[in-house]
Every structure is written in structure tokens, then in C-alpha cells.
Amino acid sequence: VHLSFENMSIYTKICGINDTKSGLLCSNLGADALGFIRYEKSPRFVELDVPLKIQENLDKELDIVFVFVNPSEKEVKTVIEKFPNSIIQFHGEEPAEFCESFGKKYIKAFHAYNLRYWKNYMDLYSSAHAFLIDSGNSVQKGGTGIAFDWKLIPKTEKEKIIVAGGINSSNVSDL
């Protein structure tokens, strides 16, 4: 599993891939990771056949990330069986023990409006390989396409932080 931030100024994960053509295009354009939503309430939910087809056609190594929101143990294990080198991203209220129980690198997501609890969060999920800060809100878990105030990003542990939400060609240099 790649997910290494060493010698890398920007790690690019394109999330919400739901068709083979888009996934391969993102790979060809230099993405470091592709994210697949495994939350059935999301309009970007994807069945496992799509990432399987993409993985079969990749001509380079990149991270495959599966995004879950409060999944069952069975849901996560099914993905791990089919994609043993994948990375799991937990985007709900999963307990740290649950996230750790699969013995894999994982990303723990939380919303920018909870940044005041950053230190507690890092302590609670100390086994997380990275933290994803998203601009989600109390209604929508993520995928809002809205940027948050990046000045709020904690100054410590920056190598473990992935920023999500509203990033585009006109504002990415502000990160």
C-alpha cells in the first residue's frame, strides 16, 4: 500500500469515481489515488465491479481507497478480500477500535467544523495513517464541493493531513 507522503508536496486523491473511463483518465493525468464511495446513501456510491475493471486496466501503481460511512464489519471485509492492497477511509462515527480491527492502513475523516477538537481526535485515532479534513456539514457527510477556511488546518502533523472539499485549479496553490 502506497499512501506515503515522503518526498511529495501534494498527494492527489480523486474521490467519487463511479465509472471506468473517469478512473483511468484520472490515473493518466497523474492522480496518486482513486477513491470509491461505499456508502449507499451517496449519489456517488459504486459497485465493486467498477474499481475491479479500473484496477485491471491500470498501467501504473496508485492507491485504491474505499470510503465507508459507519459500515458493518462484513462490508469492510468484503472489500478487503477483493482488494487486499486497498486503503480504507472511515468517514462516519466509527470507533477507533473498529477502524484498527482490520489491520490495514486507514484514513480517518472528520469535518472542518470540528477542527476545535483536532488534538482529541488525533489522540483517539492515533493509529490512523492519515486524517482527511472535509468540508462536510451536519446533513451531508462529504462530497459537498465546497472549500473550508484552510487557515484552520492544524499546523502540527501536516504530513498526516489530507484536505478535501472544493479544491480546484484556481485555489489549489493556496494550500
Regions found by a protein language model. Give the residues of each.
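Conserved N-terminal beta1-alpha1 strand-loop-helix module at the mouth
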Residues: 3-175
